[in-house]
Amino acid sequence: MLRSTTFTRSFHSSRAWLKGQNLTEKIVQSYAVNLPEGKVVHSGDYVSIKPAHCMSHDNSWPVALKFMGLGATKIKNPSQIVTTLDHDIQNKSEKNLTKYKNIENFAKKHHIDHYPAGRGIGHQIMIEEGYAFPLNMTVASDSHSNTYGGLGSLGTPIVRTDAAAIWATGQTWWQIPPVAQVELKGQLPQGVSGKDIIVALCGLFNNDQVLNHAIEFTGDSLNALPIDHRLTIANMTTEWGALSGLFPVDKTLIDWYKNRLQKLGTNNHPRINPKTIRALEEKAKIPKADKDAHYAKKLIIDLATLTHYVSGPNSVKVSNTVQDLSQQDIKINKAYLVSCTNSRLSDLQSAADVVCPTGDLNKVNKVAPGVEFYVAAASSEIEADARKSGAWEKLLKAGCIPLPSGCGPCIGLGAGLLEPGEVGISATNRNFKGRMGSKDALAYLASPAVVAASAVLGKISSPAEVLSTSEIPFSGVKTEIIENPVVEEEVNAQTEAPKQSVEILEGFPREFSGELVLCDADNINTDGIYPGKYTYQDDVPKEKMAQVCMENYDAEFRTKVHPGDIVVSGFNFGTGSSREQAATALLAKGINLVVSGSFGNIFSRNSINNALLTLEIPALIKKLREKYQGAPKELTRRTGWFLKWDVADAKVVVTEGSLDGPVILEQKVGELGKNLQEIIVKGGLEGWVKSQL
């Protein structure tokens, strides 16, 4: 089992008094548009952003259809947009090839940079071609946009409506998340990789500590952490629950770009050239974060206490040392070295060193009988480099099955998927049930070296078992959590802080108010909000949507909740699928504002995109749960508490009995600027885009 020693302590701070910014806030400040003069952005603020680049992949055609459906005919800034083909490249059906051709023709017509099937995974292309560049903000309509954080680029995912908005107007919106600091200290043992770090983090801190947070990595270990390791860690901050995973700009990163420039063999690359690297060196001299920057929490892990870790089966929240699993004699049927997580050159070489440790192709450790080991480079460039280095030949000599540079089995597409009853071990990022094939299969995640060792021995194994070397000494991982709550005394102090009112757009209410109706549960998913059986019925009238809203959660919701009420729920409200009706059904019910401890990211984006307002107030959830502790359980409960949100003052007040009753809670919240108000006034992001054309 996973063993660790964790200490928890806390200190207090108040957002209202903080002037400084962390690195995430600094980058957002640079890419925010139409801010009021002198406005300094912080976590919680809603801002309009104009990202440096926006990438979409096989979903580019649905984005294009939405773009054209809005009435748009011209890409606002063609150099901002990148399209790639990577997910379903093994599919040679006429339907898929037609879609690919449509994307290619659209890109050509609008002078968009386009990378065809076979060039590589979109995220790797963004890295190799310099679109994701240190200290810029880069988005993509894909959940693993966090990967760019390994290069010091603030990468975060968007939904298709956002992508269409960026195509048409150059911008969309973002609410700056709470920022968690993750300190990596100590020296990583020889052979332990970035994959081991992130798999351990997902398993050790598995109680949603970083859910919907931005992460900033710090620590004395960073200079010794190669860029490929950083990219792997940043990539899987998505599975950890975060919205970004940002590494700082340091000498290791700048040297990586200098080497990249040398490899390109030209000084005329549009994004990676002597001028951009010199500018980066100058920017790197500026402090990474202000001394008085605020962080929601700090997590610390001592890398010196790590060993090889494996997650699963079928969950990244379950992690064990490879030594523990090896003793369980877990037989495998398939192994995978593919995806944007771990298919870079160093990953392929790591696996090659396990199957051919001497370098002699006549002394290769063969893949075990009955095991299929699939391998694909993250890009065509990486495959060419692996062929040149000899790593590719070693893997094929061992019996690996090559696949084209693309997503393939990681996304459950193409050859080599898990069959019912099979067990697979993979260097990818997700092992959710059914993700890589059958729902009746078991999937584990591990580093390339562990995957290769397991393929050779036919069971989950450590590299040391293949190489006949000593196992890494292990006695438990040392971790620490420093929480950073806003306490009630500071909440009260916030009201005395110097005020800078938010300007209110004509037609937008200065305040929202209503009685709080409590749906006391965490992780209410989109199916609970709007039943899946209605999702693909396009003709459901508004009245029907209102009737069925929340029926899978509580059939009594329909009669207990009235138009104008404010629904309040627990944490991670709206998790699950991307159905927009989860937001529009609440609007149909007459609910204009939902409050929770936290929201699922896609639900949060779909809400604003459809003009449903949301507020995260964890302190309110705590107070309500204290109020009803020991009371008979009610799924939907009218509380008799009232909330008023003063948008101009960015403050909420909760009272008892009426809006004029005794104050229960008073707290500052993120600012909703004029740009976001305009989206709401226009009925959502699509309406706003149409108004800009």
Swiss-Prot record:
It is found in: Mitochondrion. It comes from Saccharomyces cerevisiae (strain ATCC 204508 / S288c) (Baker's yeast). Its EC number is 4.2.1.36. Signal peptide: none annotated. This is Homoaconitase, mitochondrial. Belongs to the aconitase/IPM isomerase family. It is an enzyme of class 4 (lyase). GO terms for biological process: lysine biosynthetic process via aminoadipic acid. [4Fe-4S] cluster binds at residues 340, 407, 410.
